[in-house]
Amino acid sequence: MDVLFSLSKTLKDARDKIVEGTLYSNVSDLIQQFNQMIVTMNGNDFQTGGIGNLPVRNWNFDFGLLGTTLLNLDANYVETARTTINYFVDFVDNVCMDEMARESQRNGIAPQSDALRKLSGIRFKRINFDNSSEYIENWNLQNRRQRTGFTFHKPNIFPYSFSFTLNRSQPQHDNLMGTMWLNAGSEIQVAGFDYSCALNAPANTQQFEHIVQLRRVLTTATITLLPDAERFGFPRVVNSADGATTWYFNPVVLRPNNVEVEFLLNGQIINTYQARFGTITARNFDTIRLSFQLMRPPNMTPAVAALFPNAQPFVHHATVGLTLRIDSAVCESVLADANETMLANVTSVRQEYAVPVGPVFPPGMNWTELITNYSPSREDNLQRVFTVASIRSMLVK
């Protein structure tokens, strides 16, 4: 993996900097590195593909070295270099696609394609010029079963979940009380509602709670907490739990009271925030517990009192909500990230070449299913293919 990264980094630099008119002295170190790569690769044969519709390709390396010059690089020099660069880029691209198409239930962190296994040999270590990538560093750590630490911005840590629970209901569905939520990606939105606006509740107050368990521990997280859940601020028709009928939800939004958010690790509270909104932080956690209250307004103007009558029918439904969004965090496991293209790159390659469903990844790389059942085998394989995708992204956009 280190060799593949070094190849890609060298080729990217060569493609960007070995251009007509450039002073040789400005790129002499890069050309020496490029020649070292050629010397190491010459005389070796590789094969890629042969899975799904990814065609089998044979690669033979027998290239001349780039020479020296006292002046600027001319057109002939650059054309010779480009021929070599393009062949190497095509090779790296195919090795990456071959690797992304493969998976294994055992030791999925290790190279799975024949080409990358061969590149892992001792004879190619002379190409190991640079391993400064976060993915490469953490792949090396995970390969040695040591602690990793990926920094994600908007990590897709929450499997998609859109549902509700009813604490009070009846067949007519005309006086409900409960909680509705939407968890997805890096965001939680939860709303508590009461058709009667806590009319007969103790102290005219309804208490709501929403608990979310993460599939992996997050650390040093920066989080935004807002006293609103905009996705639950408009009327909708909701299917009943048994699917036999539907019920009407017509929210009127109130501000939540006594808001508390707790971040827990192995059942122990690590951080707690009460009535604090905006930017908050959490040290390390695997569970989030949100609690908040809906209080019937003690003093209401006639217009507000008309919204919340003292008897049925309850046409308008009192609603309070919260939004919690993880803006950035560190995780020991690799995750999809809204700011990165790794998941999209891997999925597109597997779809384009009709890679058959294997023993590890779900069909279509379904992220909700993958993160819901995030086994060690999936974690190993995902870290490997995301690392390869990061390498490929240097050369292929």
Swiss-Prot record:
This protein's major location comes to virion
Checking InterPro entries in the record gives: Capsid_hemagglutn (IPR008980), Rotavirus_A/C_VP6 (IPR001385), Virus_capsid_a-hlx_vir (IPR008935)
Q: Where in the cell is it found?
A: Virion
Q: Where does Zn(2+) bind?
A: H153
- Record's superkingdom? Viruses
Indicate which residues the UniProt annotation says bind Ca(2+): N266, D286
Q: Name one GO cellular component term.
A: viral intermediate capsid
GO biological process terms, alphabetically, are:
fusion of virus membrane with host plasma membrane
| Chain residue ranges for the region called Interaction with the inner capsid protein VP2 | 62-73
Q: Give the record's keywords alphabetically.
A: Calcium, Capsid protein, Intermediate capsid protein, Metal-binding, Ubl conjugation, Virion, Zinc
Q: Could you describe the post-translational modifications of this protein?
A: The N-terminus is blocked. Sumoylated with SUMO1 and SUMO2. Sumoylation of viral proteins seems to have a positive role on viral replication.
Q: Which GO terms describe its molecular function?
A: host cell surface receptor binding; metal ion binding; structural molecule activity
Additional comments on file? The VP6 trimer contains a zinc ion located at the center of the molecule. The zinc ion is not essential for either trimerization or transcription activity of the DLP. Zinc-depleted VP6 has an increased sensitivity to proteases.
Q: State what this protein does.
A: Intermediate capsid protein that self assembles to form an icosahedral capsid with a T=13 symmetry, which consists of 230 trimers of VP6, with channels at each of its five-fold vertices. This capsid constitutes the middle concentric layer of the viral mature particle. The innermost VP2 capsid and the intermediate VP6 capsid remain intact following cell entry to protect the dsRNA from degradation and to prevent unfavorable antiviral responses in the host cell during all the replication cycle of the virus.
Q: Subunit comment for this entry?
A: Homotrimer. Interacts with the inner capsid protein VP2. Interacts with the outer capsid glycoprotein VP7. Interacts with the outer capsid protein VP5*.
* Family listed: Belongs to the rotavirus VP6 family.
The protein's name in its UniProt record: Intermediate capsid protein VP6
- Lineage of source species: Viruses, Riboviria, Orthornavirae, Duplornaviricota, Resentoviricetes
